[in-house]
């Protein structure tokens, strides 16, 4: 007799700098799907992608989830498959809905979404276009600019222009003419604050550019602003819904990778204490930003807010936001009356619409 439960394929890990974060997120997601509330609704098949892009079946995936860190060489069968995707692991034929819990390139950028689309199977999150546009900060910012959405001044840099001394200095002069210090240098296609540097002068700017160029050929440099960091969660496909707005507070100079994923380095205020009308503005902008880049399913939209100037700037969209114990997306929905168990259930249901 066929099972009445929906079989969900949770894919995590990935050939990305954010591999470890993906594992932490997957532990939360799988736990919520297998909770007492959801046990009669879903069957979970976990699939692990190692750091070379090879896909592994449930046996390996469950071991990684249990240990909470990447698979060790002895846990992987030999001889190893070639690098990258070759075929779906055993058991995948039973999957009815795919749930990618992947962060960064090769997972959040439209690549895996394209695979699921070719397979003709539903999946959680945005499609190819929304994922790709939202992942690439330069493409995303160009879309925001075309729609007239507010954002801080920025400039684009091609890593090829940093190879020679003369061209490097030319890039620095161009950036200094367009932006003021401090500024932030970011690889265009990485998340979780990976590869981001703050520059207070030309020397730090060039060091930051080299760091970003080692990770991505496309680089974005943003004007630093004095602002609070706010976030709003979005859920839905045909009809997008927004959560309450939350604020990230931290003692560090800026919200870098260590601050984001270390215990006791930051705290959140949910809902954020905001003047009347500001939360409504942010929630409206979050919807506009998602529609602008064709993001749906789920997204976390990040903002800067300067209270003295009463100015709001869009920072970025994350179409596969983290689900770790410190991640804002599930916390924002919890504060909006949607439990973690209800949230993952709704995401799977939305994927089938």
Curated annotation (Swiss-Prot):
State the name under which the record lists this protein.
D-alanine--D-alanine ligase
User: Could you tell me the keywords of this UniProt record?
Assistant: ATP-binding, Cell shape, Cell wall biogenesis/degradation, Cytoplasm, Ligase, Magnesium, Manganese, Metal-binding, Nucleotide-binding, Peptidoglycan synthesis
The ATP-grasp domain covers 141-349
Quick check: keyword Cell wall biogenesis/degradation in the entry?
Answer: yes
* Record localization: Cytoplasm
Q: What is its EC number?
A: 6.3.2.4
Carries keyword Glycoprotein?
no
Looking up InterPro entries in the UniProt record yields: ATP-grasp, ATP_grasp_subdomain_1, D-Ala_lig_Van_CS, D_ala_D_ala, Dala_Dala_lig_C, Dala_Dala_lig_N, PreATP-grasp_dom_sf
Q: State the function annotated in the UniProt record.
A: Cell wall formation.
Q: Which residues bind Mg(2+) 2?
A: 316, 318
Per its UniProt record, the required cofactor names are: Mg(2+); Mn(2+)
- In the record, what terms sit under GO molecular function? ATP binding; D-alanine-D-alanine ligase activity; metal ion binding
Cellular component, GO, one term:
cytosol
Superkingdom, taxonomy of origin: Bacteria
The entry's free-text remark on the cofactor is: Binds 2 magnesium or manganese ions per subunit.
**SUPFAM superfamilies per record:** Glutathione synthetase ATP-binding domain-like, PreATP-grasp domain
- What catalytic activity is recorded? 2 D-alanine + ATP = D-alanyl-D-alanine + ADP + phosphate + H(+)
Pathway where this protein functions: Cell wall biogenesis; peptidoglycan biosynthesis
Q: What class of enzyme is it?
A: ligase
Q: What organism does this protein naturally occur in? A: Prochlorococcus marinus (strain MIT 9313)
Residues engaged in binding ATP: 176-231
What family is this protein classified in? Belongs to the D-alanine--D-alanine ligase family.
Kindly report the protein's main subcellular placement as a broad class. cytoplasm
């Amino acid at each position: 007799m066929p099972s009445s439960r929906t079989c969900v394929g949770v894919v995590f890990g990935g050939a990305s700098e954010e591999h470890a974060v993906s594992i932490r997120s997957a532990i939360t997601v799988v736990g919520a799907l297998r909770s007492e509330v959801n046990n009669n609704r879903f069957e979970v098949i976990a699939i692990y992608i190692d750091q070379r892009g090879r896909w592994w079946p449930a046996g390996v995936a469950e071991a990684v989830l249990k240990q909470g860190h990447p698979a060790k060489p002895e846990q992987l069968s030999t001889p190893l498959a070639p690098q990258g995707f070759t075929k779906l692991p055993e058991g995948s034929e039973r999957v009815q809905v795919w749930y990618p819990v992947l962060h960064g390139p090769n997972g959040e950028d439209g690549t895996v979404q394209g695979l699921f689309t070719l397979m003709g199977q539903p999946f959680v999150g945005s499609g190819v276009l929304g994922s790709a546009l939202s992942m690439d900060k330069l493409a995303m910012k160009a879309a925001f600019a075309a729609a007239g959405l507010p954002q801080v001044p920025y400039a684009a840099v091609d890593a090829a222009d940093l190879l020679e001394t003369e061209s490097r200095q030319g890039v620095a002069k161009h950036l200094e003419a367009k932006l003021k210090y401090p500024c932030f240098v970011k690889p265009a296609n990485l998340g979780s604050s990976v590869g981001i540097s703050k520059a207070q002068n030309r020397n730090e700017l060039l060091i930051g550019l080299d760091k970003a160029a080692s990770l991505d050929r496309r680089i974005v440099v943003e004007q630093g602003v004095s602002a609070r960091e706010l976030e709003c969660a979005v859920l839905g496909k045909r009809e997008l819904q927004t959560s309450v707005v939350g604020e990230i507070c931290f003692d560090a100079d800026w919200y870098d990778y260590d601050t984001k994923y270390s215990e006791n380095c930051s705290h959140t205020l949910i809902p954020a204490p905001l003047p009347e009308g500001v939360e409504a503005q942010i929630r409206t902008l979050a919807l506009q930003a998602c529609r602008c880049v064709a993001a749906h399913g789920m997204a976390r939209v990040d903002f800067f807010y300067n209270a003295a100037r009463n100015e709001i700037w869009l920072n970025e969209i994350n179409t596969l936001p983290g689900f770790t114990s410190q991640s804002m997306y599930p916390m924002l929905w919890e504060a909006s009356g949607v439990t973690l168990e209800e949230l993952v259930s709704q995401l799977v249901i939305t994927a089938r619409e």
